[in-house]
């Protein structure tokens, strides 16, 4: 209900009008006075006075309303400008009369305008705006004379009482402003009111209490935090002062402490050396002389614990180790502390020696357990270890590694991993050497090592070197073992055979699979802790997994393992020590902290240096000093270990396979063949040899790895320093601080080798396991580089074959979007069959990301290219030196500048970030320039930075160099450098090369062109004439010749193979899926189509058929498929009549081909053009099991045309054969004379009878011209599917054709049928127009524009025809830019195609153009001026442009007589697309007036030329037969003087079959009608059943009457009623359930769509029947006997509701 103040506001506007003004009163007095003067006694009546007053009042009101309207419009514009988006217009309303207004006599109010304004208070921020309203105002017609309608609606926050109060206030204010503009003032008043009441909405008391508590708690916490910060600041200031003071004090004592520590270390080292010397002598004496001492007892305890642990399971190992510790502790109580430590060291030292000996023996398969036991006995006699320890040398014991792990867990840098001994056990040689040979080799190696090192060969010396290096070696060995709980997939599945190659990235090993026994190549790559580098490494795996080609190395699988076990590839040569420095024992033995006890304590104390005591500091200093003294012994032991390993590994002379020799037969995916960094492109430094370059690549890659490791440590060091400083401030421990400072300074004075080894040691400690990537690939025995170096002793054809294989492989790689970037002979391999395999995709990248490499990708690229790319030694070394200086100077700077605190750390971090950015930039630049010397293109040298991006043409440049090396052999390496440099820079070939290999030289020049755009792609190279033909191509051609010959004996075998079911299962799932999910566009073909689709199709077809029946059209069906006549159609428009068919059918199995020996179809205008249209949309070609090609019809009109042509060809053959018999009869009569008159008369009688039944072609055409054939057809046409295995696309189409008449009336009738059809359809009537043009006018247009090329015509016409949907400037842009047409030519096109309108309007424009253009006003024939149409006698176009316009005028007259609206036919000259489909005359389209301008139908004249000339035949046999016939005819004419011209002209003349027709896309029509019908259905159904989901989806017809029953046992009654109705001709239906529920029957009756529902009810013994009319909503009671009579008398029409 509206508020009461609103009613009050309407009262002023409803007051009676004011009295008339004085002018009106004077007018009334004048009227009265004039009446008195004229009439004398006559007085005016009351009616005249009232009428005069009414007129005056009306004129006054109209003038007033006009003035007020202008004033209202001005106010509305001002308000809209002021409030902008807050002003919204509304529809005005009329307040009708109610009881109150009728009683008071107030007239209804009519508003002229109504609007709404959003009012907010005067608040700047929306967050503080808590209230807002909508002020709705309505202007009466007499506003502002009367009050406006004002209404206040709450938008936000304002209570309803306040809104009523504001509305009353505004009404009161408006009463005082009558006659003036007031809305803006009212808005200001409303804003003031809202500003006063702009309060935050009130909430509950609990919420207010909670919010208040939160505010108080926030304030309290803020105060506490401020106090805590203040206290912390004071404490920091106090600690800073104390620390500064202590720092200065410690600095004064620094020099003294330094000297004391040196003296202390020297003294301790001397004492320890003397003690060790005495202790070792004692041990030797005890073991050699045989006295049993406490030490032996202790040793027996150890042996017991070890043996016990060996016999038990793995779970008892901890107990064994605990027993060992307990026994150890018990024995130590009887001795001094120093002796107990030494005894423990001796026991562990002996165990370590045994472990090292066992590991060394595992690498030699010729060593047996007997050999090891003999060697152990000799070592026992020397006193190296106890006899009870010999059990640890058992190579088949798998539990020993766990014992070593428990004993040496304090000395190992990483946890022990188990080594798989089962693999090595299988490789033991049964025919081993004798023990003497093995033992002599062992001791000879030891003697040689001691001689080289200058030491004595005493047992004490060997024992001491084992002590010094044992820890290091043991640690190194521990790195190469695997956890017993982790099974190595690599060692369990594969057996290593040979190392094929090694690079900076990893190794490639030849292995044998233990399961299948085949050989493979496995690439082992060590992964980095940096995830970005790992992603770069894994890029090769991803690339290989995408490639599957016969000339690309096959990829099998890849996996990652956490570590790598010992194998022949792990003990590398000297040049690989730097590559795997973290795994080599030599690199660890170089470290000074290699002793077991000292190394452990130093590592523990260095991690807890801030919390350690002064005593631990002294111990650490002692041990570090000892490490410096023992460094020489460690190096000595390292040399011994290396020499010993080489003897064991390379005893058979196979050490050469592990070297980086580039001249051997090694196979490497990471071959460093002439690797280089293009930024340092120095050829003189690369001449030294391949081995030197390869070694440099490995060393530089090592430097890059060291640089990355150091950078990672440098990132973590500031954080560690910061945490250390915080601990110092809290603990205030100046001693630990001074200790750290002294420690850092002592470390900075160590040599560079020691600092590098210590950094390696830290990296090893941090990483518990290092993952390896294994890539299993195809094993190839040879590489192309071996052949190019020694010379390819092959025939020229074989070299071309190999080159073609390389090109095919690169074409496939480039087709996958991959750039190899490192194509060279070392990366091209041969398989076992001698075919090419392209490999090493370590540098391959995606072609799309070449020009936009991210910094991360560039960094990764630099890492991945280490295998085939040598970096700049100067640049890399400078970066490494900078990093080392930073690591050395950073601790000093930190402790010297510790006063500056956090500021110094921030500066260091900023410097580190800047250096890292510079390093990334350098790496990005270097990475972009990847490749191999002499094989990189100029754009590769320039890199990818900036605008010089490269693509797959860089591989083609490399291919050119490779191709040159395949034809030319270099005598020396120096010659190779000079020749390749001249070839790259100057394009100069060696002498006699270009003369002997001219084709090769041309091809090489193309490939190494400096402009990438001029280089051919791999696909273009395969198709080039410079490439010799492929042998496989010749095989294919020969096979095609065989299988296309039906007389060949293998022809039927080939067909049986093609039609076998071996491959049908590959496409069966696609076929069945399409059958089940994608229904055909022909709705009648769908078994489960919905109800409305079937109804719409039936109704539309009935409407069209009704219209066609009125035009006397009959249904004539054409075959859906036919024998194909042209497989590859070559558009040959306007051929000469004498020319034969371009292509003919390859088989002669049909009767049609046999019977058309003298009658062929001339491939002239329409046939070729129609075939071209078919080619564009795609024909559906099928083949039967006999090899016959069949074509599914593409268009109903084309099918009808082919059908007519075939019928007339058969007619011509029949007519010719008939007259041939007549000629024979006449010939017989002339020879026999008149001997038998009776027989002659009978024969003439038969001839006359045959003449009456046989007609010629021209006679039939003459009859059809008077009464043409009108036919229609509803059918389906097919299009070629887009995917293999799918069904051809099926479309519904309707066509109407008029055959036999050349008159324009047939064209007009076709368009008349078109308009009647679309006018009868509700979805298209008044929403379409006919787009008309003439074929002859289009041809004149092309002649006027100056375009003669047929292809260009079709392309331009396709663009120009889009003017109905696109503006001219868009079409003009395409013509200028895409087709490159001159501007004048485009302007000429515009003068034609922009002309459209009704037929009279366009004719006026064309007449004017004809007068101004001599080309159009001439009388020349179009056919004579058009070369493409010079002999087309069948074209029915006029000879001049004037005649063409007369045709259009005549057509317009026909339209007028047929009552076709002139506005429905648009003469559009831009409609020129598909004009080649039509041969002559009119062509038109039916276009919807909607935005998309969709085409629903096309039509026009497509006459078919028919040539019955027997001189042109499709086969030689027919030509010979026809020539014989001609000779016989000529002889007959000459001999008998018979006039044969009549008969010869009957079939020696070209005929024209006139056809005009219409094709309608029924799918589009069905869709539109279905949508409209569905809307009507939803309106008819109740709201509860109006949804599509509740409608019947699987029913084929709609009943008119539906019978239901309410009660049991009425099923038979329902069936009886349905039967009676059906017998009477009504469509009745019921449910097929005997006793359904009433609800089910009610739903079924409604959803069925029936017009009438019969309900049967049973009340006692009586049965009542009610008939309900759904449309009229009426029910009638009908008896059982009168049901049929009821529907008969009701004039029931079953389809009245469905008429369209």
Curated annotation (Swiss-Prot):
Name of protein: Probable serine/threonine-protein kinase ifkC
BP GO annotations: cellular response to amino acid starvation; DNA damage checkpoint signaling; negative regulation of translational initiation in response to stress
Gly residues bias: start-end ranges: 466-477
Sequence similarity: Belongs to the protein kinase superfamily. Ser/Thr protein kinase family. GCN2 subfamily.
Annotated region described as Disordered, given as residue ranges: 1-25, 454-488, 568-639, 689-760, 850-901, 1134-1160, 1216-1253, 1507-1531
Keywords: ATP-binding, Kinase, Nucleotide-binding, Serine/threonine-protein kinase, Transferase
EC number: 2.7.11.1
Comp. bias intervals (Pro residues): 14-23
Superkingdom of origin organism: Eukaryota
Occurrences of domain RWD (ranges): 74-197
Catalysis performed (reactions): L-seryl-[protein] + ATP = O-phospho-L-seryl-[protein] + ADP + H(+); L-threonyl-[protein] + ATP = O-phospho-L-threonyl-[protein] + ADP + H(+)
Chain intervals with Basic residues compositional bias: 736-752
Skewed-composition ranges (Polar residues): 454-463, 479-488
InterPro entries associated with the record: aa-tRNA-synth_II/BPL/LPL, Anticodon-bd_dom_sf, CC_SR_Kinase, Gcn2, HisRS-like_core, HisRS-related_dom, Kinase-like_dom_sf, Prot_kinase_dom
Positions annotated as active site in the UniProt record: 822
């Amino acid at each position: 209900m509206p508020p009461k103040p609103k009613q009050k506001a309407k009262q002023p506007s409803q007051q009676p009008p004011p009295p008339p003004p004085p002018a009106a009163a004077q007018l009334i007095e004048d009227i009265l006075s004039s009446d008195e003067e004229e009439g004398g006694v006559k007085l005016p009546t009351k009616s005249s006075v009232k009428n005069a007053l009414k007129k005056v009042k009306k004129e006054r009101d109209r003038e007033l309303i006009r003035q007020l309207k202008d004033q209202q419009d001005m106010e509305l514009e001002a308000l809209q400008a002021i409030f902008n988006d807050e002003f919204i217009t509304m529809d005005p309303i009329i307040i009708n009369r109610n009881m109150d207004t009728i009683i008071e006599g107030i007239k209804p109010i009519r508003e002229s305008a109504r609007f709404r304004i959003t009012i907010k208070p005067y608040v700047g921020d929306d967050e503080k705006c808590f209230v807002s309203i909508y002020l709705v105002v309505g202007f009466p017609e007499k506003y502002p004379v009367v009050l406006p309608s004002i209404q206040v609606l709450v938008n936000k926050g304002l209570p309803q009482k306040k809104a009523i109060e504001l509305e009353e206030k505004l009404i009161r204010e408006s009463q005082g402003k009558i006659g003036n503009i007031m809305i803006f003032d009212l808005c200001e008043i409303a804003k003031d009111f809202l500003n006063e009441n702009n309060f935050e909405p009130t909430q509950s008391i609990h919420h207010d209490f909670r919010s208040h508590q939160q505010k108080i708690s926030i304030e309290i916490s803020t105060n506490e935090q401020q106090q805590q910060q203040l206290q912390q600041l004071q404490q920091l200031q106090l600690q800073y002062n104390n620390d500064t003071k202590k720092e200065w004090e410690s600095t004064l004592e620094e020099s003294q402490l330094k000297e004391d520590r040196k003296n202390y270390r020297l003294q301790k080292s001397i004492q320890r050396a003397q003690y060790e010397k005495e202790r070792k002598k004692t041990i030797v004496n005890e073991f050699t002389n045989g006295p049993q001492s406490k030490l032996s007892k202790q040793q027996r305890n150890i042996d017991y614990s070890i043996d016990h642990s060996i016999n038990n399971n793995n779970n008892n190992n901890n107990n064994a180790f605990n027993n060992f510790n307990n026994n150890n502790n018990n024995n130590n109580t009887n001795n001094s502390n120093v002796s107990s430590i030494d005894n423990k060291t001796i026991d562990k030292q002996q165990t370590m020696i045994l472990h090292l000996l066992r590991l060394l023996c595992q690498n030699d398969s010729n060593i047996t357990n007997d050999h090891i036991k003999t060697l152990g006995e000799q070592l026992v006699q020397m006193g190296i270890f106890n006899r009870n320890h010999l059990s640890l040398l058992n190579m088949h014991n798998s539990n020993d590694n766990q014992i070593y792990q428990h004993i040496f867990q304090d000395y190992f840098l990483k946890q022990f991993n188990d080594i798989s001994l089962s693999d090595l056990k299988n490789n033991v040689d049964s025919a081993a050497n004798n023990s003497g040979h093995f033992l002599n080799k062992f001791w000879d190696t030891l003697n040689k090592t001691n001689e080289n090192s200058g030491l004595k060969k005493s047992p004490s010396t060997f024992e001491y070197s084992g002590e010094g290096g044992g820890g290091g070696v043991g640690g190194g060995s521990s790195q190469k073992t695997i956890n017993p709980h982790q099974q190595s997939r690599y060692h369990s599945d594969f057996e290593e055979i040979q190392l094929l190659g090694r690079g900076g990235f990893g190794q490639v090993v030849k292995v044998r699979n233990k399961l299948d026994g085949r050989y493979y190549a496995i690439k082992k790559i060590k992964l980095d802790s940096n995830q970005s580098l790992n992603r770069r490494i894994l890029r090769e795996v991803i690339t290989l997994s995408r490639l599957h080609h016969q000339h690309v190395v096959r990829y099998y699988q890849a996996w990652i393992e956490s570590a790598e076990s010992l194998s022949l590839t792990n003990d590398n040569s000297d040049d690989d020590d730097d590559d795997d420095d973290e795994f080599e024992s030599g690199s660890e033995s170089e470290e000074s902290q290699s002793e077991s006890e000292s190394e452990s304590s130093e590592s523990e104390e260095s991690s807890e240096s801030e919390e350690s005591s002064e005593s631990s500091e002294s111990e650490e200093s002692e041990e570090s000093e000892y490490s410096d003294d023992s460094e020489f012994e460690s190096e000595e032991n390292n040399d011994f270990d290396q020499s010993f390993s080489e003897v064991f590994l390379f005893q058979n002379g196979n050490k050469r396979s592990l070297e980086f020799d580039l001249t051997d037969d090694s196979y490497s995916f990471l071959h460093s063949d002439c690797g280089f960094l293009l930024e340092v492109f120095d050829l003189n430094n690369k001449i030294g040899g391949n081995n030197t370059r390869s070694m440099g690549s490995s060393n530089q890659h090592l430097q890059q790895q060291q640089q990355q490791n150091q950078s990672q440590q440098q990132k973590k060091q500031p954080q560690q320093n910061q945490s250390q400083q915080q601990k110092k401030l809290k603990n205030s421990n100046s001693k630990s601080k001074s200790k750290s400072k002294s420690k850092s300074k002592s470390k900075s004075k160590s040599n560079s080798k020691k600092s590098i080894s210590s950094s390696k040691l830290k990296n090893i400690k941090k990483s518990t396991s290092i993952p390896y990537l294994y890539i299993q690939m195809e094993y190839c025995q040879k590489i192309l580089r071996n052949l190019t170096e020694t010379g390819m002793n092959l025939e020229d054809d074989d070299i071309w074959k190999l080159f073609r294989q390389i090109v095919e492989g690169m074409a496939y790689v480039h087709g996958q979007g991959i750039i190899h970037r490192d194509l060279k002979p070392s990366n091209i391999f041969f398989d076992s069959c001698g075919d090419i395999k392209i490999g090493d995709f370590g540098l391959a990248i995606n072609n799309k990301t070449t020009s936009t490499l991210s910094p991360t990708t560039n960094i990764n690229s630099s890492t991945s290219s280490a295998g085939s790319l040598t970096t700049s030694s100067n640049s890399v070394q400078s970066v490494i030196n900078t990093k080392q200086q930073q690591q050395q100077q950073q601790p000093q700077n930190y402790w010297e500048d510790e006063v500056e605190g956090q500021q110094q750390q921030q500066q260091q971090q900023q410097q580190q970030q800047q250096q890292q950015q510079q390093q990334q930039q350098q790496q990005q630049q270097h990475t972009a320039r990847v490749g191999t010397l002499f094989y990189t293109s100029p754009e590769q040298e320039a890199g990818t930075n900036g605008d010089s991006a490269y693509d797959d043409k860089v591989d083609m440049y490399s291919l050119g160099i490779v191709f040159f090396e395949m034809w030319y052999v270099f005598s020396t390496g120096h010659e190779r450098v000079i020749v390749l440099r001249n070839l790259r820079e100057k394009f100069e070939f060696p002498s006699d090369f270009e003369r002997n290999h001219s084709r090769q030289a041309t091809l090489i020049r193309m490939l190494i062109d400096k402009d990438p755009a001029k280089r051919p792609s791999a696909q273009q190279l395969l198709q080039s004439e410079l490439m010799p033909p492929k042998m496989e191509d010749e095989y294919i051609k020969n096979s095609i010749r065989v299988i296309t010959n039906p007389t060949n004996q293998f022809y039927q075998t080939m067909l049986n193979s093609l039609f076998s079911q071996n491959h049908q299962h590959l496409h069966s799932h696609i076929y069945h899926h399409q059958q089940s999910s994608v229904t055909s566009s022909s709705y009648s073909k769908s078994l489960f189509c919905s109800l409305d689709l079937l109804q719409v199709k039936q109704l539309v077809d009935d409407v069209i058929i009704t219209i066609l029946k009125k035009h006397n059209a009959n249904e004539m069906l054409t075959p859906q498929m036919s024998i194909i006549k042209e497989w590859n159609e070559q558009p040959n428009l306007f051929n000469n009549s004498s020319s034969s068919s371009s292509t003919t059918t390859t088989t002669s199995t049909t009767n049609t081909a046999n019977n058309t020996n003298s009658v062929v179809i001339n491939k002239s205008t329409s046939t070729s053009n129609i075939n071209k249209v078919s080619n564009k949309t795609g024909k559906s070609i099928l083949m039967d099991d006999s090899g016959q090609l069949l074509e599914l019809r593409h268009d109903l009109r084309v099918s009808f045309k082919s059908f007519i042509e075939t019928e007339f060809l058969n007619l011509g053959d029949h007519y010719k054969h008939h007259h041939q018999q007549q000629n024979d009869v006449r010939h017989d009569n002339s020879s026999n004379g008149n001997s038998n008159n009776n027989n002659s008369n009978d024969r003439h009688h038969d001839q006359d009878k045959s003449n009456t039944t046989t007609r010629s072609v021209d006679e039939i055409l003459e009859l059809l011209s008077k009464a043409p054939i009108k036919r229609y057809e509803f059918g389906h046409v097919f299009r070629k599917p887009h995917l293999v295995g799918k069904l051809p696309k099926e479309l519904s189409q309707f066509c109407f054709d008029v055959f036999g008449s050349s008159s324009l009336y047939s064209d007009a009738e076709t368009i008349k049928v078109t308009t009647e059809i679309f006018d009868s359809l509700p979805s298209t009537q008044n929403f379409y127009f006919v787009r008309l043009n003439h074929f002859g006018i289009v041809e004149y247009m092309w002649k006027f524009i100056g375009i003669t090329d047929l292809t260009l015509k079709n392309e331009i016409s396709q663009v120009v025809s889009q003017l109905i949907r696109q503006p001219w400037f868009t079409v003009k842009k395409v013509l200028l830019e895409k087709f490159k047409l001159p501007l004048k030519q485009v302007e000429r096109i515009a003068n034609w195609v922009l002309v459209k309108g009704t037929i009279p309007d366009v004719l006026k424009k064309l007449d004017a153009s004809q007068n101004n253009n001599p080309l159009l006003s001439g009388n020349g024939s179009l056919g004579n001026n058009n070369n493409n149409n010079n002999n087309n006698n069948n074209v029915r176009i006029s000879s001049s442009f004037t005649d063409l316009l007369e045709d259009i005028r005549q057509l317009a007259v026909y339209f007028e007589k047929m009552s076709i609206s002139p506005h429905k036919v648009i003469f559009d000259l831009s409609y020129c697309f598909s004009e080649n489909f039509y041969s002559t005359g009119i062509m038109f389209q039916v276009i919807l007036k909607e935005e998309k301008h969709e085409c629903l139908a096309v039509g026009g004249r497509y006459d078919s030329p028919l040539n019955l000339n027997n001189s042109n035949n499709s086969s030689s046999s027919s030509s010979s037969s026809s020539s014989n016939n001609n000779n016989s005819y000529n002889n007959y004419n000459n001999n008998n003087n018979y006039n044969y011209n009549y008969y010869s002209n009957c079939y020696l003349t070209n005929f024209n079959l006139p056809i005009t027709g219409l094709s309608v896309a029924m799918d589009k029509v069905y869709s539109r009608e279905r949508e409209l019908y569905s809307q009507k259905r939803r309106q008819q159904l109740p709201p509860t059943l109006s949804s599509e989901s509740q409608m019947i989806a699987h029913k084929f017809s709609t009943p008119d009457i539906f019978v239901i029953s309410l009660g049991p046992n009425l099923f038979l009654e329902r069936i009886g009623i349905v039967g009676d109705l059906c017998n009477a001709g009504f469509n009745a239906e019921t449910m097929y359930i005997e006793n359904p529920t009433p609800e089910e029957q009610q739903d079924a009756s409604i959803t069925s769509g029936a017009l009438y529902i019969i309900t049967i009810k049973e009340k006692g013994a009586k049965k009542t029947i009610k008939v309900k009319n759904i449309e009229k909503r009426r029910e009638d009671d009908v008896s059982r006997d009168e049901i049929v009579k009821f529907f008969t008398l009701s004039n029931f029409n079953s389809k009245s509701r469905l008429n369209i």
